Curated annotation (Swiss-Prot):
Family listed: Belongs to the small heat shock protein (HSP20) family.
Designated name of the protein: Heat shock protein beta-3
GO biological process: response to unfolded protein
Superkingdom of the organism of origin: Eukaryota
Record keyword Kinase present: no
Domain annotation sHSP: ranges: 47-150
This protein's GO CC annotations: cytoplasm; nuclear speck; nucleus
Claim: Cytoplasm is one of the keywords in the record: yes
Gene name in the database record: HSPB3
Chief subcellular location: cytoplasm
Associated clinical condition: Neuronopathy, distal hereditary motor, autosomal dominant 4: A form of distal hereditary motor neuronopathy, a heterogeneous group of neuromuscular disorders caused by selective degeneration of motor neurons in the anterior horn of the spinal cord, without sensory deficit in the posterior horn. The overall clinical picture consists of a classical distal muscular atrophy syndrome in the legs without clinical sensory loss. The disease starts with weakness and wasting of distal muscles of the anterior tibial and peroneal compartments of the legs.
Localisation per UniProt entry: Cytoplasm; Nucleus
Organism: Homo sapiens (Human)
SUPFAM superfamilies recorded: HSP20-like chaperones
């Protein structure tokens, strides 16, 4: 029986197709910044990537705006229904869990689950936390700046 290797879309994300044209595919294979969703440390990743190669689109890098959230997490949860996702806080930690039962996909049956933990900034209260599930399957969890601070 012949050995078959299935390549998933994560190896070649469509959102970075222009960058693949500017750089060789092998150069991008180990560039972990390509696989990160924007989050608290994405600014550092973008600076590192910009130093390594010329920017493809300068409009993609926007400075943080005054008065907006200072802590934001974006998760791709397109495979989960809103009722499959649990968001909790416990002793200064944000826990995001999701799990769905067995489903049929193009390759057979699959069940998915994940747990992510993030350390919340000091002084953050539960009432300052907001979560939105966007229509494209991105979960946005953010903590708004307290009034009077920058």
């Amino acid at each position: 029986m012949a050995k078959i290797i299935l390549r998933h879309l994560i190896e070649i994300p469509v959102r970075y197709q222009e960058e693949f044209e500017a750089r060789g595919l092998e150069d991008c294979r180990l560039d972990h910044a390509l696989y990160a969703l924007p989050g608290p440390t994405i600014v550092d990743l973008r600076k590192t990537r910009a130093a390594q190669s010329p920017p493809v689109d300068s409009a993609a890098e926007t400075p943080p705006r005054e008065g907006k959230s200072h802590f934001q997490i974006l998760l791709d949860v397109v495979q989960f229904l809103p009722e499959d996702i649990i968001i909790q806080t416990f002793e200064g930690w944000l826990l995001i869990k999701a799990q769905h039962g067995t489903r049929m996909d193009e390759h057979g049956f699959i069940s998915r689950s994940f747990t992510r933990q993030y350390k919340l900034p000091d002084g953050v209260e539960i009432k300052d936390l907001s979560a939105v599930l966007c229509h494209d399957g991105i979960l946005v969890v953010e903590v708004k700046d307290p009034v009077g601070t920058k």
